[in-house]
Amino acid sequence: MSRGKNARDDDDVSRLLAAAAKTISHVRYCWLLTGAIHARPMGHVMSDPDDWHIRFVTGSRSRKAADIRNAGRIGLIFQHDPSEAYVALTGAATLVGASEVERLWKPAYDMYFPTETDRVNATFIQVAVERMELWIRGVTPEPFGLQTTELARNAEGTWRFSDRNLKGSKSNADSG
């Protein structure tokens, strides 16, 4: 693979990651799906778009917390209709410990955990995003919605086009 092709792929991946982060920042709620086919809308807190860790506050005694303890993998779906942008993320999910809950806690969460018992049983789901599927009008290849653009994080943490990416999608990105 030529150095120019690598640089072009890096630029394309950076552009796609920026568009995905922008989409997520515009969406107040997303769907969180566990392997047990349980899904529910969740308000999200994205720590830093560069590290692709997303957190949610939840009760440690909830069904979704139990699902995460059992499976440790989840999917997240974000949809921003005004910009015709759709982002599906998958990754490893963990429940953070008490000291991390204290560090991340904000007074705004008290309304969802009104009693001391509720607050003691609060935790954060932390998702380390490993893969993403993107459909973002004006960013992913045309014709819009017919091909999925997939990115995957390698062992070093670098984002690349997924091996499962359709060749047509990748070549369309290369031609621009």
Regions inferred by a protein language model and the residue ranges of each:
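A short, Trp-centered hydrophobic/proline-enriched beta-strand micro-motif
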Residues: 22-36, 74-78
